[in-house]
A protein has these predicted regions:
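Transmembrane beta-barrel architecture of outer-membrane proteins
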Residues: 3, 29, 59, 87-89, ...
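Outer-membrane beta-barrel translocator/receptor signature
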Residues: 53-55, 68-70, 81-153, 161-168, ...
Length: 275
């Protein structure tokens, strides 16, 4: 919110030691560099769970809406490799918003790209309800974003691709006792992006086109319990992310450049801590 970001990629740009790059003017592929290392050396977690697959990671930095994020934790250096094999450069842990009080918020931003008539149009909604006893609560979010294609040098080819995305999600908790709780989280993201030339025509009629249509579902369920003195803590969790992608990557009006990809990532585990 302080950075007026609409997605995770924009918010990470303000983190010290982290660099976000746009590496393709057609599809808008972004990667995050930690300590100068390429993006595939960084592990992205959602609520500390490694469900952010390699397929999702290609465009995922722009697909996670800012209004579902409570905070972002960045761990730099090889020590973060404890979180996964990809975490050589560092780890980015996205913590989703948890309900803390009854509230509702509606926001809309309109940003001009390079002072042109291309705009990034973003609408966000957040609401949360917490019971009077504080034993249960739920927060919901929604976002609708449209970004026009931006052609900086007027050659007919985009430097920034079109994005149309919609996302909804929730996070809830229920305290089963004084020192135990169940937490559930779910989100759904639809995103369409298109870059190249002749954006108003089918991609196989353009000179060059990259078009990607994503449908992403993800969620998690966790149980936490601790002793009264917090010296003994136990956590069990299960999480998933399912991604379906339809794409076109081609040039010279190639009719055979369409493709589909499906990816399912499931993670589960338990942790016991004694101090």
């Amino acid at each position: 919110e302080r950075a007026n970001a609409s997605c995770l990629a924009q918010g990470l740009s303000f983190q010290p030691g982290v660099r976000v790059e746009d590496d393709c003017q057609n599809c808008g592929f972004t990667q995050v560099r930690i300590n100068g290392l390429d993006g595939h050396y960084s592990q992205i977690l959602v609520d500390s769970h490694p469900v952010f697959s390699s397929l999702t990671g290609v465009y995922g930095l722009e697909q996670i809406p800012a209004n579902m994020i409570e905070r972002v934790e960045v761990l730099r250096g090889g020590g973060s490799a404890l979180y996964g094999s990809s975490a050589i450069g560092g780890t980015i842990n996205v913590i989703t918003k948890e309900p803390s009080r009854n509230s509702a918020q509606l926001a809309h931003t309109l940003t001009s790209l390079g002072g042109s008539n291309s705009y990034d149009n973003n609408t966000m909604l957040n609401a949360s309800i917490v019971s009077e006893s504080g034993r249960a609560g739920i927060s919901v979010f929604g976002q609708s974003r449209h970004r026009s294609g931006y052609d900086h040098d007027g050659d007919g080819f985009t430097e920034v691709p079109v994005i149309n995305s919609q996302s909804v999600g929730m996070r809830s908790f229920f305290r089963t006792g004084a020192y135990s709780r169940i937490t559930a989280q779910y989100h759904h993201i639809n995103e369409f992006r298109r870059g190249g030339d002749m954006l108003d025509r089918p991609p196989h009629e353009a000179l060059i086109a990259e078009q990607i249509d994503h449908s992403i579902d993800g969620g998690s369920l966790s149980f936490d319990i601790s002793s009264p003195d917090r010296r003994n803590r136990f956590n069990a969790y299960a999480s998933f992310q399912n991604t379906a992608r339809k794409s076109y990557y081609g040039s010279k009006q190639d009719p055979d450049a369409y493709g589909t990809t499906h990816d399912l990532t499931v993670a589960a585990g338990m942790q016991y801590i004694h101090e």
